[in-house]
Amino acid sequence: MIAFSLTMELSLPVFGVTQANKEEWDNIWKNFQQFPNVSRTLGLLRRFFLRNDLGFLSAVVILKQYVENLPTTKQKLNLIECTQGLKFLIRSLYEKIKDQCDVKSSIREIFYDCKARLLLLLEEGCGCGACCATSAALSKVGHLGRPPKLTPHKPHCSAQSALTCVHNHIILGMNPGMSEWMVLEIMFLPSDFYDFNEHKNEISLVATCINCCWLYFMLQQYMSSDLLAIEEALNKTYLALHPNDKASYSNILKFLTSNSHREHVTQKVNVKAFMQSSLYKIIKDTEKNPSPKTKMLMISILGSRGIGMDLFCSQSVLKAPLIDHKLSPVSEYEDFDEDEVELCISDDEVDSEDGNLCVLDDESESVNSVALRQVLTVDKQANEKEYKKIIDKSDDRDDRDKDEYELENEEYNRDEEEDEGEDEEDEKDEKEEGEDEGDDGEDEGEDEGEDEGDEGDEGDEGEDEGEDEDDEEDEGEDEGDEGDEGEDEGDEGDEGEDEGDEGDEGKDEGDEGDEGKDEGDEGDEGDEGDEGEDEWEDEGDEGEDEGDEGEDEGDEGEDEGEDEGDEGEDEGEDEGDEGEDEGEDEGDEGEDEGEDEGDEGEDEGEDEGDEGDEGEDEGDEGEDEGDEGEDEGDEGEDEGDEGEDEGDEGEDEGDEGEDEGDEGDEGEDEGDEGEDEGDEGEDEGDEGDEGDEGDEGDEGEDEGEDEGEDEGDEGTKDKEGNANKVVQNPFDYYNWLQKSTLSIVHNKSIHATEHMLEDQLQHSLTASFETHLYIKPFRNTKESQAATNFVYFREQV
């Protein structure tokens, strides 16, 4: 005989479990206790029994009674109230969107309607690429899918992150830790859709409603998925064994216990836990309306985000709905037929002290006849007692809530009265502070008037200091004028030097004659050499005469240049002095007028007292006029400075003339050296004439002439070859061209023949270089500088 408590434990045979595979069977349940994953355990059991439906049915019965006793199942039942609140919130939002008072659509219909509306708003409100991508992602997702991001114009969405986290936890069979306050994380505000203008309010409500629907479906899936999977496995397996029978908890237990054998391993099953109706409770209670407390909680959550208060103006949230007193399990309670179930319980077999039932165990019988007396009556009585306790607790809770509400109202009214009294006192204090500030302002105004009068006196002192500084500037200008006179005298000398340069050109021609003398000196031993010497001497004398004439002209030019420079400097100084005098006179007049008007304004301000501000204003105007006069004086000084600048320019020109004169002096020195060499050559020729070897002298003359001609021809060829080389390669002539250009600027002769300039340089060089200049880009700075010098050189030629 086996003793059972009132929990009604049965020894359930498990068909297919033997001593050979009992270890694997035990490991399955150990793993389930450590990691209670229902779907994974069902898969392991199905694989363990393969095609043995009877053994699998026993295993599912054992699994159900384990799941009913899990702590997570109790947590899931506590989420029923949260699901009711979400359902109430979804319907309220949908009524606001549709502008209707009563909506009878299901949550699934509301979800797909809002989804279609959101797709339309995204396309019509914006229609950009991001909106099209969001629409495409939303159109592919159902009410049980992974939620996409609903804010197309924002890179991140906190609502989508929260929903994705919950979705992943549910897929992995983990507790997502959801509550009513999660609604705050999945709500949208109009500011989240600021780019949609007039549609932003509607689109925020529609998107919030869709997120709430997703959260509602996730809650339902989390609460009912495990129990629903067990129910489906029980029904499917039992109907496979008994197609014509009704699948119920009692029929399943009767069927399994009627086929027990000794070779089968048995497992104890808690009948009460197996008969519990958690799934039925979840389904039925979710359809009920939420309690007033839950409604108020949802309203407060929405109000914390600034929306939702107008949604529930017509909701009578304080009226408690009628409560259904009837409780029933998933499978309706069934009365066992006493004829079908053999009860082997006698009165003397019941222990009244411990309440245990003694069930007879007949070893000869193969069937374990279990006395399944219905405990429904006992369960109903217990349920009724529990229900009464719940009703009493709810009534007490409602009474406490009302009392707390009244106390809060009284405290709120008292606080408002106290706040009003404090506000009146604050207003009085503000008025007194305003009067004090007015008095202080008057005192400050008087003090400021006196301070401004003092500032006027300081302004007069500043004007006097400014006049003293002007006097110092005048003295400095006088000293500068004296320096300008000296510079003018130097300019006159510079102009004379410029004219002296013209004489240097004549000396250059004399130098050519000296070169001829040098060539003639080689053949001085003969008579023909003497004649050549006389001719070259005559030409040299003529060159010297021309040089002397050039020097005379240069001296005259210098005198004229000095006279013109003196006149220009005198005119510039006179104009500068006149401008300075005019500016100073105007400045003095303006300052005198400003001082007089300032004194008058100050006197009037002191006499009138409170009306002194007007006098100070007039004084300021006078000071402004004085400043204008000073500005005019500054303008006169500027004109004087311009005159000085003109004088400086004249000095610069004089300096340039001096430089050119110095170059002319160098040319004179070279001419003198050439004359000395010519005299030496004449002396050597005279010595040759004195010798008796006339024939040798003639031969020497012939050889000297031939060598001179050959050297002259070679020099000419070299010059022509260099010119041709320059012309053939335009970029190799850079140094020669630069020297030639500088020679032109300083009035020197170009070291090239007229034939080269006219025929070759002017023609070939221009053609070849201009082609590169206007067609090809320059390769470096050297080429660019060469091009610039070439253009200037061509203009000078």
UniProtKB/Swiss-Prot annotation:
Annotated segments matching region Disordered:
394-724
Q: Where is the composition biased (Acidic residues)?
A: 404-713
Q: Where are stretches of biased composition, namely Basic and acidic residues? A: 394-403
This protein's source sits in the domain of life called Viruses
Instruction: Give me the gene this protein comes from.
Output: 48
Organism annotation: Saimiriine herpesvirus 2 (strain 11) (SaHV-2)
Q: What is the protein named?
A: Uncharacterized gene 48 protein
Question: Which family does the record claim for this protein?
Answer: Belongs to the herpesviridae BBRF2 family.
